[in-house]
Each structure stands twice: as structure tokens, then as C-alpha cells.
Amino acid sequence: MASKSQILFIGGTGYIGKFIVEASAKAGYPTYVLVREASLSDPAKSKVIENFKALGVNFVLGDLYDHESLVKAIKQVDVVISTVGHGQLADQGKIIAAIKEAGNVKRFFPSEFGNDVDRSHAVEPAKSAFETKAKIRRAVEAEGIPYTYVSSNFFAGYFLPTLNQPGASSAPRDKVVILGDGNPKAIFNKEDDIGTYTIRAVDDPRTLNKVLYIRPPANTISFNELVSLWEKKIGKTLERIYVPEEQLLKNIQEAAVPLNVILSISHAVFVKGDHTNFEIEPSFGVEATALYPDVKYTTVDEYLNQFV
């Protein structure tokens, strides 16, 4: 087996980043996280930083907005994984420029980890965020940088604890709001599993210049099926309140940030079916559970047990 690629994370202490960094370290990859000096002493990040230290993660001092520090950090590694948040998506052009100058990167994973932005029917404000991600894809391709785009669909930890009920702090016990007719299938993946699959793809020639879709069959489920599964677990039938698409579109326009973003992404997935309304063609994509059948992923059924 060839030696494992060295991986640099940019945005590694963020929401999804920390899971992928952990998966990288646990799989024995030499793992580097770009951090600003201030982040190392930030109380809000102390738990994540301590966990990284315990896992043997290396910290590289630098900044997305300091070109020289970025180039220097990238020159030390083989693979760059960006997990920057919503507000920094457009700034990934700076990573592309640094990768280009460094000239040694075997693979770049831009910050994706959601819907496939090239196959989207999203309305605003999600539309603009997806367009920003798509522009980054085009820039990566135009520069001839080897890539993998990870389309991991929904984070289980974000949507399942409340069954996607806006403003709720726990899963519903009496009534549940369902967007649209509840029939399009969506996909929910546990964040740790997203980390595992992403890291498996790093040195895999089958994922080179492809979209890696994470579509576990057991986690591909319509909203109606999700509610039925939850009802079975709590031994209770919920009142289902369906919100027609027309009403949902109006709600999106009237909502403030961040609710309008959440609702517009929910509309794309639960009404338009953007997780599952296309076939994965070998010309552009591969599917994670097919490539890595040995990975035991957490199913939606298992995941919901903790909330009963």
C-alpha cells in the first residue's frame, strides 16, 4: 500500500470540518489543520482544539486571507480539504490561487457537503449559495486542479433531532409540519459517516474528478416515511399538517435570515426532490456505499432511537 496522503484542512474547526478532521486522524492520515493564532486560544474552540491535539492533529499557523501563509501550508501536503462555512464559500478562490502557485496538490475537496449544486432547483436565498459553490467548481476545473466534490445531502444532526420543525428544540409529539406532499425522497447522513466516506475517497482513483454522492439506501426516505417511522417509535399517531408549495414559497419570501435559507433548502429537497431526482451517471459521479460496502453507516432508524 502506498503511503497515505498528507491532508490539510481549511475550516477544520467548523461544524462539518471537525468530523472530517477526526475521521482523517483516526484513519491514520497525517492530518494538518490551518488555524489562526487567535483560534488556538479561543474559548469557543477549546474543546475541538483539545480533541484534535489528543488525536495527533498538526496545527499549521496561517490564514485564508494571507496568501503566503496559505501557499506555505499547502506545500507541506498532498491533499487540501476545504470545509469553510457559508460566509467564506466565495473566498475559496484564494485557496485555488494558492494551490495553483504551490503546484503540488494531488486532490482538492472544495467546501460542498450538501446538495449537488449542479443539479439544483433551489429558490433564493439558497439559490445564491449554491451558485457560489458551482462557481468554485468551475474555477477548480478551469485551473485543471484534480478534485472530488462530496455531495453528502443532509446532516442528520441538523435535521433529525426536531424532524425539521423550524424553531423546535425536540422531535414532535403531537403534530408535525410537512412541506409539500411529503413524498419526494431525501437523504440524511450522520456527520461521522460523512467524515468516514470523505476520507476513504482521498486516495481512491475512482473518486478523482468526480462527485462522491453519499446515498445510503437505508437513509433515503420520504418525509411521510420519516414521520411514520417516528410514530412507530413513540407509539403515537401525529397530526400531519401539510404546507402546499405555494404557501411555502410565500413563507420563504417573508422569513428573515437564517429561516429563509433553511426553508429554501428544505423546499429544494422535500418539495423538488433535489437529493434523489436524478440518476448518478458514471461520467460525473460515484456513490459512497457502493464504493465502500464495508463501512457500517448509521441508519435513520437507528439515529432516531436516541430521541424517543
UniProtKB/Swiss-Prot annotation:
Keyword list, A-Z: Allergen, NADP, Oxidoreductase
Binding-site positions, NADP(+): 11-17, 36, 45, 137
Catalytic activity: (-)-dehydrodiconiferyl alcohol + NADPH + H(+) = (S)-isodihydrodehydrodiconiferyl alcohol + NADP(+); (+)-dehydrodiconiferyl alcohol + NADPH + H(+) = (R)-isodihydrodehydrodiconiferyl alcohol + NADP(+)
Pfam families: NmrA
Main enzyme class: oxidoreductase
EC number(s) recorded for this UniProt protein: 1.23.1.-
InterPro entries: NAD(P)-bd_dom_sf, NmrA-like, NmrA-type/Isoflavone_red_sf, PCBER-like
Catalytic residue positions: 133
Superkingdom classification of source: Eukaryota
GO MF annotations in UniProt: phenylcoumaran benzylic ether reductase activity
Keyword NADP recorded: yes
Gene Ontology annotations of biological process type: lignan biosynthetic process
Membership in a protein family: Belongs to the NmrA-type oxidoreductase family. Isoflavone reductase subfamily.
Entry function: Oxidoreductase involved in lignan biosynthesis. Catalyzes the NADPH-dependent reduction of phenylcoumaran benzylic ethers. Converts dehydrodiconiferyl alcohol (DDC) to isodihydrodehydrodiconiferyl alcohol (IDDDC).
Protein name: Phenylcoumaran benzylic ether reductase Pyrc5
Classification lineage: Eukaryota, Viridiplantae, Streptophyta, Embryophyta, Tracheophyta
